[in-house]
């Protein structure tokens, strides 16, 4: 914003203050207090440069860091470090407990900034147990399948197959069997009668020969 516009606004404010004072809206003390708070003329070169607390950035140490050389800042877990400069993604410069130095960026996390997320370069991640499990091979999968317990009897997985009922022979075939058995019995009876007749005939012939010899 240009300096002329700012100075014009200051002039308008003083004019309004004079009007309020003349109208008995504000007292002389209030008028003097406000008028003294305003600069006579605004100069960009003389503008105050006060750093607000919100612009300060702090980090919290996660791990202990022992200085390796001059200029390093030793850290202990829980130390609050005022961040002065980010030299690189790997190294920060900060101040803690009256000491200023350089420390690893992945040894700290943001603090007092409303964010609890990790730093830009977190330590190596911890692998989950699920990721460490080996993928089973085909042989191991087959072995595990064979070692599975048998299912309970209620599942009827191993039930014996039901015996199919034997079908009765057709009526025609059964009738033929009955006829064959009946004819076989008739032949047997007829043969028995023939045998008896032959025996009777032979006996009668012998008897007649004996009678003829007597007479």
Curated annotation (Swiss-Prot):
Domain of life (superkingdom): Eukaryota
One GO CC term, this protein: actin cortical patch
Motif PY motif: chain residues: 124-127
Span of domain SH3: 54-113
PANTHER family given in the database record: JAK PATHWAY SIGNAL TRANSDUCTION ADAPTOR MOLECULE (PTHR45929), LAS SEVENTEEN-BINDING PROTEIN 1 (PTHR45929:SF7)
Domains as described in the record: The PY motif is recognized directly by the WW domains of RSP5.
Additional notes on this entry: Present with 2190 molecules/cell in log phase SD medium.
Protein name: [PSI+] inducibility protein 3
Lineage, opening ranks: Eukaryota, Fungi, Dikarya, Ascomycota, Saccharomycotina
């Amino acid at each position: 914003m240009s300096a002329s516009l700012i100075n014009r606004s200051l002039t308008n404010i003083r004019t309004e203050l004079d009007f309020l004072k003349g109208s008995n809206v504000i007292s002389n003390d209030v008028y003097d207090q406000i008028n003294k708070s305003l600069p006579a003329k605004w100069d960009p070169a003389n503008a105050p440069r006060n750093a607000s607390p919100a612009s300060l950035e702090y980090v919290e140490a996660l791990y202990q860091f022992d200085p390796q050389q001059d200029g390093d800042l030793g850290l202990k877990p829980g130390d609050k470090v005022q961040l002065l400069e980010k030299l690189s993604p790997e190294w920060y410069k900060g101040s803690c407990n009256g000491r200023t130095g350089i420390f690893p960026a992945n040894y700290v996390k943001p603090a007092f900034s409303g964010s609890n997320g990790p730093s830009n370069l977190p330590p190596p991640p911890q692998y989950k147990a699920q990721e460490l499990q080996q993928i089973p091979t085909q042989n191991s999968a087959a072995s595990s399948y064979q070692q599975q317990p048998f299912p309970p009897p209620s599942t009827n997985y191993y039930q014996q197959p039901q015996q199919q009922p034997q079908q009765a022979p057709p009526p025609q075939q059964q009738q033929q069997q009955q006829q064959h058995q009946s004819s076989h019995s008739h032949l047997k009876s007829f043969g028995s009668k023939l045998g008896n007749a032959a025996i009777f005939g032979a006996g009668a012939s012998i008897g007649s020969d004996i009678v003829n010899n007597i007479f």
